[in-house]
From Swiss-Prot:
Enzyme Commission (EC) number: 2.8.1.6
Sequence intervals crossing the membrane: none
Molecular function in Gene Ontology: 2 iron, 2 sulfur cluster binding; 4 iron, 4 sulfur cluster binding; biotin synthase activity; iron ion binding
NCBIfam families: bioB
Organism in which the protein naturally occurs: Shewanella sediminis (strain HAW-EB3)
Entries under Pfam families matching the protein: BATS, Radical_SAM
Full protein name: Biotin synthase
Residues binding [4Fe-4S] cluster: 56, 60, 63
Record: residues binding [2Fe-2S] cluster: 100, 131, 191, 263
Subunit structure: Homodimer.
Cross-referenced SUPFAM superfamilies: Radical SAM enzymes
PANTHER family linked: BIOTIN SYNTHASE, BIOTIN SYNTHASE, MITOCHONDRIAL
Cofactor(s) it depends on: [4Fe-4S] cluster; [2Fe-2S] cluster
Function: Catalyzes the conversion of dethiobiotin (DTB) to biotin by the insertion of a sulfur atom into dethiobiotin via a radical-based mechanism.
């Protein structure tokens, strides 16, 4: 790591001035900082698995998992630990160093916690970093997950405080900040970013990044999502964001949070190779890899590796675990799955009913 001075006092007009730079100047500034901190040709790869899909009681206007919108999404119960580990092993074999697990909840409940903690500890035993996104967390829940070994917790701010009320009404901006505070206090790393292309103004994109950069400690990982418009959601007919505005957002995030991983997240399937290359040059150095991001499509793994080869990029290397370690973990998971099979109907429930 470099000795770049980190700031937590960014003014809104300073960030807007960065967005307004000529593109070449902005990219040069972002890339120069990026090279001082990171290997510019290394990309951290994460795999995201939906461990509980649909029937969420929240009203996020971008989200097909909300029970309030008819998007044709089939709701699913919390999946078994054994299946989670099978997916984690596949992700690791494909080059992922971090495995992220997401559930469509407002927040987890007490009966969920034993299963969630088992998922964390068993995935970690495979030599992977772990991340979860489960909605809001209390301080006690954050401590439990940290004790189980959870490395990262994702909870996005979504947009600026000023535009937030146009996106969601069932959870406040302060609720999100409180969850992030609980995560950090428990000793976990924070993963927090937002979504662009939701009809916001450029000032809102600056406002989102200002909130993230002015946290007491910058998020360790900053996912920047491009809105994926899903039929049946209130945002299905919004105009597309200019791709260069997305690249600008990546570049400004890199400049004001130079030590954070900046992740290309949702919407990457619609991006051209050239646009992705610009994002990597601007400072993006993390992606989600393969299949789906919870419910939206993502580029196939072989497409990503082909692009990496063309650009001379390489994945970050994960921790090593032996074949014997993997076998032991899978055997434990199978035994646990059999032990809880009779209780499954009570344990895995419809979150939308709560």
């Amino acid at each position: 790591m470099s000795d770049i001075q980190l700031r937590h006092d960014w003014k809104h007009d300073e960030i807007e001035a960065l967005f307004a730079l000529p593109m070449n100047d902005l990219l040069f500034k972002a890339h120069s900082l990026h090279r001082q901190v990171f290997d510019p040709n290394e990309v951290q790869i994460s795999r995201l698995l939906s461990i509980k899909t649909g029937a969420c009681p929240e009203d996020c206007k971008y989200c097909p998992q909300s029970a309030r919108y008819d998007t044709g999404l089939e709701k699913e119960r919390l999946i078994e630990i054994e299946k989670v580990l099978t997916e984690a092993r596949s992700a690791k074999a494909a080059g992922a160093s971090r495995f992220c697990m997401g559930a469509a909840w407002r927040n987890p409940h007490a009966r969920d916690m034993p299963y969630l903690k088992d998922m964390v500890s068993e995935v970690k035993a495979m030599g992977m970093e772990t991340c979860m996104t489960l909605g809001m967390l209390s301080g006690t829940q954050a401590e439990e997950l940290a004790e189980a070994g959870l490395d990262y917790y994702n909870h996005n701010l979504d947009t600026s405080p000023e535009y937030y009320g146009e996106i969601i009404t069932t959870r406040t901006y302060q609720d999100r900040l409180d969850t992030l505070s609980n995560v950090r206090s428990a000793g976990m790393k924070v993963c927090s970013g937002g979504i662009v292309g939701m009809g916001e103004q450029a000032s809102d994109r600056a406002g989102l990044l200002q909130q993230l950069a002015n946290m007491e400690q910058h998020p360790d990982s900053v996912p920047i999502n491009m809105l994926v418009k899903v039929a049946g959601t209130p945002f299905e007919n919004l105009d597309d964001l200019d791709p260069l505005e997305f690249v600008r957002t990546i570049a400004v995030a890199r400049i004001i949070m130079p030590h954070s991983r900046v992740r290309l997240s949702a919407g990457r399937e619609k991006m051209t190779d050239e646009m992705q290359a610009m994002c990597f040059f601007a400072g993006a150095n993390s992606i989600f890899y393969g299949c789906k991001l919870l419910t939206t499509n993502n580029p196939e793994e072989n497409e990503d590796m082909t692009l990496f080869k063309r650009l001379g990029l390489h994945p970050e290397q994960g921790k090593y675990a032996t074949v014997e370690d993997d076998k032991e973990v899978m055997a434990k998971a199978s035994a646990k799955a059999n032990a809880i099979k009779d209780k499954q109907s009570g344990a895995f429930y419809d979150a939308g009913a709560l």
